UniProtKB/Swiss-Prot annotation:
A motif (Cx2C motif 1) lies at residues 81-84. It comes from the Eukaryota. The C-terminal domain binds 2 Fe-S clusters but is otherwise mostly in an intrinsically disordered conformation. The twin Cx2C motifs are involved in the recognition by the mitochondrial MIA40-ERV1 disulfide relay system. The formation of 2 disulfide bonds in the Cx2C motifs through dithiol/disulfide exchange reactions effectively traps the protein in the mitochondrial intermembrane space. InterPro entries: Anamorsin, CIAPIN1. It comes from Leishmania braziliensis. Residues 33-119 are annotated as: Disordered. Keywords: 2Fe-2S, 4Fe-4S, Cytoplasm, Iron, Iron-sulfur, Metal-binding, Mitochondrion. The lineage of its organism: Eukaryota, Discoba, Euglenozoa, Kinetoplastea, Metakinetoplastina. Monomer. PANTHER family: ANAMORSIN. This is Anamorsin homolog.
């Protein structure tokens, strides 16, 4: 048995393949669905969204149970991720509280120090 004289390439790095247009692949129904699923950000609302994933809903339920939730709701820290109170390990890159210790989320970034004597 002899091998064929010519070989074919399965791919080539030299020729550039045309890239498919993503918008051409979507139907009108897909575009409407995509616009409808864009949710609002919890940071712009007074209360947590119905389908909250940032942890604000759990925090509000906990504060409501303790009776600490003000009637206007809680204000999220300016970072927007909702993890500013947890500490540097959980904060986003543009968090204004980077480098500060963890704090209670109801205190708006104020850290309580115990300045009493230990003696």
């Amino acid at each position: 048995m002899s091998t064929p004289a010519t070989t074919t390439q399965a791919f080539s790095l030299k020729t550039r393949q045309p890239i498919a247009d993503e918008d051409a692949l979507l139907t009108e129904e897909d575009r409407i669905l995509k616009q409808a699923t864009k949710g609002e950000d919890c940071t712009t609302r007074r209360r947590a969204c119905k389908n909250c994933v940032c942890g604000r809903a759990e925090l509000e339920r906990k504060l409501e149970a303790e009776g600490k939730l003000p009637p206007e709701g809680i204000t999220m820290p300016p970072g927007g991720c909702g993890n500013c109170a947890k500490g540097d390990a959980f904060r986003c890159a543009n968090c204004p509280f980077l480098g500060q210790p963890a704090f209670d989320s109801t205190e708006d970034g104020k850290v309580k120090l115990n300045l009493t004597d230990d003696i």
